[in-house]
Amino acid sequence: MSASGASYAASGVDIEAGDRAVALMRAAVSKTAGPEVIGGIGGFAGLFDASRLAMMRRPLLATSTDGVGTKVVIAQRMGSYGTIGIDLVGMVVDDLVVCGAEPLFMTDYIVCGKVVPERVAEIVGGIAEGCVLAGCALIGGETAEHPGHFGPDEFDLAGAATGVVEADSLLGPGQVKVGDVVLGLASSGLHSNGFSLVRQILDDADLDLDAELAELGSPLGAELATPTRIYARDCLALAQACQVHAFAHITGGGLAANVARVLPPDADALLNRASWTPPPVFGMLAGRGSVDSDEMEHVFNMGVGMTAVVAPADADKAIGLLTQRGVLAWPLGEIADGSGRAELTGRHHERS
């Protein structure tokens, strides 16, 4: 090819930069690997030794795929990329654990306008940290460079995870009974939902991410970037120790809509707002954006990141176990006769 001819590098794709990113992320990824992981990163496929599944009576493989939505824009604006990968793991594995499945391994996909090796490695480092928190291996991934489609500082990411659960330990609507107690597990904040609305509120109110807001007590950007809490190990420990009938991961659609997904057609969940006070970030967004309460509850988790439906005899034990594990939990409501709906009643207590 002549010096003036077309080339992949001239089109904006830097293969060498991708190779450098892989080299920089290698140590972080290796920390997620247990003895089941065969080989390291760089192969065409990730390999996982599933021999122990042969000891299970009827193993069911479970899979989940998700992303972090437009929370990536917050990371891009702040130039901080170390925790957005934790968000990704939380969104994926905590959907997986809802059915009682133990996460085994995860893969990721990062697409960007320009591969900056240090930035990609920082993102993957967060994914690896999240996998350690979740107890699963990061066995593969892809970094794609899309010049002209994404700006040089823009990126998106997604991931998929696979887990396993015994068929007779499967959680969900079939196990939920009238009289069960619904426990709320506190979120770490917004998690990774509703950020398109968040950004609209910030833009309309002309708020910068470095703004110090009295109602938050911390810089706005730091509050918004707080990583999603990963509940996987806590939920699995709870299911081992207590009569858990269902979990619900509170993501897009809010508390009521997600709890309704794990209800049988002849039962309702009655959820009491007076049982908890949403963290200040939710009140800040509602006030600064003039967002009504119905919209807030439909978009955001409002301080409840996961729910557990447990047998009433085990409710106190479950709360105690979660407390020991550092997860704030409380009785949020109960299961009653009904038609498969979740209903929020009462009013939140005002924050003192």
Give the location of each predicted region.
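N-terminal amphipathic/basic leader segments beginning at the initiator methionine
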Residues: 1-36
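Glycine-/charge-enriched secondary-structure boundary and capping motifs
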Residues: 3-10, 27, 119-137, 150-157, ...
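Residue-level signature of catalytic and energy-coupling elements of molecular machines
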Residues: 14, 66, 179, 249, ...
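Short, acidic Gly/Pro/Ser/Thr-rich loop/turn segments
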Residues: 18, 54-55, 68-71, 166-169, ...
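Hydrophobic face of alpha-helices
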Residues: 22, 121-124, 195
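Glycine-rich phosphate/pyrophosphate-binding loop regions near the starts of catalytic domains
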Residues: 27-188
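Acidic-glycine-rich active-site phosphate/pyrophosphate-binding loop
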Residues: 59-61, 67-69, 173, 210, ...
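Short, acidic (Asp/Glu-rich) active-site segment that either coordinates a divalent metal cofactor
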Residues: 65, 156, 169-215, 220, ...
